[in-house]
Amino acid sequence: MKTYFYQQLNGLDRRVYDEIVNGLHQGQLKISVSSFSSVKKVAVDIFNNYPQYFWIASRVRAMRTLLKTVVQFDQSYSVSDIRKYQSQIKELVQKFIFENINDHQTDYDKVLILHDYLKNSIEYDHQAAAHVNDKTNRYVSAYNIVGALIKHKCVCDGFAKAMKYLCDQIGIECYVVNGIGSNMQDSAPHAWNIVNIDGCYQHVDVTWDNQFMDDNFPLYAYLNLDDKTIARDHSWDKRLYPACTSLEYNYFKINNALIDSKAQLKKFLIDSFSLEEDIIQYRVDKDSRLASEIFSCYQEITQEAIQACKYVRIGDIRTQYQMEQLVFTIVPKYVD
């Protein structure tokens, strides 16, 4: 599948892109290409969106002579390790797809399954993140699908490339996005995904749904967002990726948990408590009046909802919120 970025390239750049991808497919580390100036332009997209070539280091050198231009990649693993990891990844992914994916599921269902699998099976590699400028191969797996799928420990690049790889295996269009992740304290380079669900492009950031959750608070704050919503704490070059213009497949919209008023929130909580749901999660619509009031009123509304439940008793609740995305999670303790 040709990437969105590829479709924006001119003829010469496309030719160089194809020459590099074809060379990598044949296992080459030195590849002759048609243009020196095109190499840097296409290399990042190839690194991101061909995660099956996990053994190439994220460095590329282009050497120009009178007769030709040669692109040279560094190899991050031995040949025996490459074959071992290829075999392990193939076996793992085939088993996962056989057990979890079927033709009766919608694309939304499939993206949700992939999101949850990666979110729940991977530990964020804080040590690798702290040594981002390390010039050795000590942390190389944290940045590719070996770390994500085999070692179950990686940074955002590994999460995003694993999501891309799994989507490729089940026929869902997906891209790795490079940009900046921000909060009130800090900002740093970050990677996440854009997926195509029934013709609707949506942002998915598995890393942040993984990092901001604990054992009691699973998070869906970054599952299927439009450009406007994710831009609250992410920035990227929009020219390089398809526009995400709708929240049609947002997790909270699909689950009727996108809240825009106090009355709607109270009813949502009453219904959730009455069903004795173990974990309750909702998103406040940023464009609603409630968004400016929620932090001063959510506790009061929660207590009103508890008191309005006739047949359910709640002894205690735990609440956590994700401030930038206005996502709230409640874990109630029901009393028999």
Give the role of each language-model region.
Residues 1-96, 290-296, 301-336:
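Linear, non-domain "peripheral" regions
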Residues 75-77, 180, 208, 286:
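A mature extracytoplasmic/lumenal domain signature
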